[in-house]
Amino acid sequence: MTNIRKTHPLLKIINNSFVDLPTPSSLSSWWNFGSLLGVCLAVQIMTGLFLAMHYTSDTTTAFNSVTHICRDVNYGWLLRYLHANGASMFFICLYLHVGRGLYYGSYTYLETWNIGIILLFAVMATAFMGYVLPWGQMSFWGATVITNLLSAIPYIGTELVQWIWGGFSVDKATLTRFFAFHFLLPFIISALVMVHLLFLHETGSNNPTGIPSNSDMIPFHPYYTIKDILGFLIMLTTLSLLVLFSPDLLGDPDNYIPANPLNTPPHIKPEWYFLFAYAILRSIPNKLGGVLALVLSILILAIIPMLHTSKQRSMMFRPTSQFLFWLLVADLLTLTWIGGQPVEYPYIMIGQVASILYFLTILILMPLISTMENQMLKW
């Protein structure tokens, strides 16, 4: 008798995706982050669901409802901090996952890559709207500053901003709709994840060498299920340590002050995972230029497949390209640091240099070095 997992209509899909899936035998730990992102999404949806049961999306009670969750709800503090720090873990895994794709040339799977970019935007939008919900000072002013950027769009900018706000400033209508979208988007993300996996399983996984591995495949289970479980344990341990020992390490103390439209905080800044993009935005003196640079800093990922000039897929055997890749990583870390600093000398200048270097590395230096490597190998 054939095993039920191979014949049952529903189990067959799961089997072909997670059990009998032919997988390259050489995958390193860098391939763990996809499954870790799945765990992050599950944790966020579960904790978020329970938080939503006690949260009220009204400007007069939102801040107090979060306080109530932390003080009066059984393990409410745990739910709240798991959700807040879970978002940080989500973005750490997300950036490492994208970085892996860049390093090993996974972007040549165009459909998978493009759905991944849409997912990145969706997760960023969800996180931004979630940060507004506690209705602290940074929630309110962060929402005001970021939504106000849309007013830089010619002709329709002002109307667009007021349409999003649902009034003439960030207020009750804004908070209510942000809560609605923050609740809805994770389920849309879940659907997109399935499409992402669907496209990935059409082509099969890439591997560290970048060379087709059709002749050397192993089943996903038990080899990679065990490997993924180790990843889960490491990530969940890290998250637990963060939540239980320093839950506010990555947050902003200003968000413990209730939102006050009459009092602007000295330094308005988003959560740490958006600081690199915020630094790029601030480094351009023109409002519209800054907004375009902000969007392009992420959207640039979409044109990376077109900029691939190397005859090799992966950077594994390309030391010069590796140097540029790590230069880009260092540049992004510099931008993250700058995004959290006040707008004054020398931070403005460092931010401008780092922003130029970011676009220069991706658009010009990487394709140029790849072509040079081809020449050196007489290809």
UniProtKB/Swiss-Prot annotation:
GO cellular component, one term: mitochondrial inner membrane
Keyword presence, Heme: yes
Cofactor binding note from Swiss-Prot or TrEMBL: Binds 2 heme b groups non-covalently.
Binding annotation for heme b b562: 83, 182
InterPro entries: Cyt_b/b6_C, Cyt_b/b6_C_sf, Cyt_b/b6_N, Cytb/b6-like_sf, Cytochrome_b, Cytochrome_b_C_euk/bac, Cytochrome_b_N_euk/bac, Di-haem_cyt_TM
Keywords from the named record: Electron transport, Heme, Iron, Membrane, Metal-binding, Mitochondrion, Mitochondrion inner membrane, Respiratory chain, Transmembrane, Transmembrane helix, Transport, Ubiquinone
Pfam family, one: Cytochrome_B
Assembly, per entry: The cytochrome bc1 complex contains 11 subunits: 3 respiratory subunits (MT-CYB, CYC1 and UQCRFS1), 2 core proteins (UQCRC1 and UQCRC2) and 6 low-molecular weight proteins (UQCRH/QCR6, UQCRB/QCR7, UQCRQ/QCR8, UQCR10/QCR9, UQCR11/QCR10 and a cleavage product of UQCRFS1). This cytochrome bc1 complex then forms a dimer.
Organism ancestry: Eukaryota, Metazoa, Chordata, Craniata, Vertebrata
Residues that coordinate or bind heme b b566: 97, 196
Membrane topology: Multi-pass membrane protein
Function recorded in the entry: Component of the ubiquinol-cytochrome c reductase complex (complex III or cytochrome b-c1 complex) that is part of the mitochondrial respiratory chain. The b-c1 complex mediates electron transfer from ubiquinol to cytochrome c. Contributes to the generation of a proton gradient across the mitochondrial membrane that is then used for ATP synthesis.
Predominant location category: mitochondrion
Gene Ontology process terms (BP): mitochondrial electron transport, ubiquinol to cytochrome c
Note: Heme 1 (or BL or b562) is low-potential and absorbs at about 562 nm, and heme 2 (or BH or b566) is high-potential and absorbs at about 566 nm.
Organism domain of life: Eukaryota
UniProt protein name: Cytochrome b
Signal peptide: none
